[in-house]
A protein has these predicted regions:
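Conserved kinase catalytic-core helix
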Residues: 55, 92-121, 155
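Hydrophobic residues embedded in beta-strands of well-ordered beta-sheets
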Residues: 74-76, 131, 138-139
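Single conserved hydrophobic/aromatic residue that forms the stacking wall/gate
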Residues: 1-15, 194-204
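Conserved structural core of kinase catalytic domains
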Residues: 41-45, 50-100
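Catalytic-loop of the protein kinase fold
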Residues: 115-134
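ATP-binding glycine-rich phosphate-binding loop
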Residues: 22-34, 44-45, 57
């Protein structure tokens, strides 16, 4: 048996690769006790202010990350043990109002946390495959090599919510469409999207 001749780490380690947003390469590693998401960009790795801040602080709502250079590229390794991606969550069950409300509340808290640590909110990935959840707590991926505008990324995320919302729950549909509608306005403010009354308090 070929597997029996390998070490336990090799037997249980599995790697899956795919192309991510913005041309990033994604790789996933798992063993008996841990799981990691690895993002690779074409930029030369730099141990800059962002990486020092990420590695020296447990920033609320962000996945823990370690960075390294490899073949003139940058690799960012995220600890995802015990968590599932938002994409996987949506494949199991449609998004309900409480799920969307909880997500938005935590997302806005993360935006403020990122700003408080003088990091760039545009480096947050809002790809459903890069956002993780465990016990209803969401963890976001901050990637220094990621390009793009956070407003455009959020607009794409709202399109995902519109597709994956539970259409049997009227208030969930209302919230998903309201977020999507707001994200199409010019120069909108994400952090102000949740200052309006809850759909529970409105006639739907």
């Amino acid at each position: 048996d070929t597997d029996r001749s390998r070490g336990l780490g090799d037997v249980y380690k599995r790697q899956d690769c795919r192309k991510g947003p913005g041309g990033m390469r994604e790789e996933y590693e798992r063993d008996l006790h841990h799981a990691w998401m690895i993002l690779e960009t074409d930029e030369l790795y730099k141990e800059d202010y962002q990486m020092r801040m990420l590695m020296e602080n447990a920033i609320p709502g962000l996945l823990s990350v370690r960075g390294q250079g490899k073949d003139d590229k940058s690799q960012y390794r995220y600890e995802i043990s015990g968590k599932i991606s938002v994409k996987a969550k949506g494949e199991k069950e449609h998004w309900k109002f409480a799920d969307l409300e909880n997500f938005m509340r935590q997302f806005i808290q993360v935006l403020y946390a990122v700003k408080n640590y003088l990091l760039n909110v545009n480096c947050l990935s809002l790809d459903p495959g890069h956002i993780y959840v465990s016990d209803e707590i969401y963890y976001f991926c901050y990637c220094p090599g990621l390009e793009g505008n956070i407003l455009e990324k959020f607009h794409e995320l709202t399109e995902y919510f519109v597709r994956e919302t539970d259409y049997e729950q009227k208030e969930a549909v209302y919230l998903a469409y309201e977020l999507h509608k707001a994200s199409m306005e010019e120069n909108y403010n994400i952090c102000l999207l949740y200052t309006s009354p809850s759909p529970r308090d409105r006639s739907v």
